[in-house]
């Protein structure tokens, strides 16, 4: 990349990508130009670090990764030791947890565009309620069918806020800052989210029992819903600001 790659288009003498692609999509955050004189660090500090909306949407990913890795990492051991599943039964529940994500991610973007007018967070909050209920069922049930179905629901629904938060991140910042915003979200999700879902869950489960680990996951559900709600308020605020600016223009 260092030999063949370059900077942004205008660093190479080309017009901005919005002009090249003739993108007609209306952005929430509109700038007069792409601030061609700003370095990557300046973009990060001015458009990412200071934007509370970017932090909220990044922590959506933190909490969803906490839930996903908490279930994914500890599902085999939990089902074998606590629920008394055989290895084949455990493998079935594990496979359903993973494969159930495919239809939900395919439909999530279409549903938000069609029925929620491009609003990403309402559907995310709805699916997170389902995730919380499914975790409780997965935690308390004992028969194979119920536990497997609950694991499938968690796997199906948890990927919806993960996917939609990635879309929302791009929409919350100017086009030239989308890469930095996505990078922050990815960094936090792995440093905090996956670490909490694996290591912290394990420590709590070992010291205080499996229930402590599941309380951590339910805390993550509540925290994620809160961040989705605050992100949604931020989107509505940006839309009002954009409408007001259009009237005065």
Show the residue positions of the predicted features.
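Cytoplasmic membrane-interface "Motif A"-like loop-to-helix N-cap segments
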Residues: 113-128
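A membrane-interface helix-boundary motif in multi-pass transporters
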Residues: 119-122, 202-221
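A late C-terminal transmembrane helix in Major Facilitator Superfamily
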Residues: 175-207
């Amino acid at each position: 990349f260092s030999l063949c790659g370059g900077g942004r288009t205008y660093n190479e003498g080309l017009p901005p990508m919005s002009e090249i692609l003739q993108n007609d999509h209306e952005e929430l955050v509109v700038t007069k130009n792409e601030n061609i004189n700003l370095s990557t660090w300046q973009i990060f500090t001015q458009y990412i670090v200071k934007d509370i909306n970017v932090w909220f949407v990044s922590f959506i990913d933190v909490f969803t990764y906490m839930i996903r890795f908490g279930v994914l990492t500890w599902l085999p051991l939990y089902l074998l030791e606590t629920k008394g599943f055989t290895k084949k039964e455990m493998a079935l529940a594990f496979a359903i947890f993973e494969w159930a994500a495919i239809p939900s991610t395919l439909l999530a973007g279409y549903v938000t565009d069609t029925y929620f007018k491009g609003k990403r967070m309402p559907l995310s909050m709805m699916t997170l309620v389902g995730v919380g209920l499914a975790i409780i069922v997965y935690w308390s049930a004992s028969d194979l069918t119920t536990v497997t179905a609950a694991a499938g629901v968690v796997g199906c629904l948890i990927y919806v806020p993960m996917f939609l938060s990635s879309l929302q991140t791009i929409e919350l910042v100017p086009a030239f800052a989308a890469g930095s915003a996505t990078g922050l979200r990815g960094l936090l999700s792995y440093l905090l989210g996956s670490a909490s879902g694996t290591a912290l869950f394990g420590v709590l489960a070992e010291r205080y029992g499996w229930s402590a680990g599941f309380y951590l996951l339910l805390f993550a559900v509540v925290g994620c819903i809160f961040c989705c709600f605050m992100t949604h308020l931020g989107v509505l605020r940006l839309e009002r600001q954009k409408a007001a600016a259009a009237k005065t223009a």
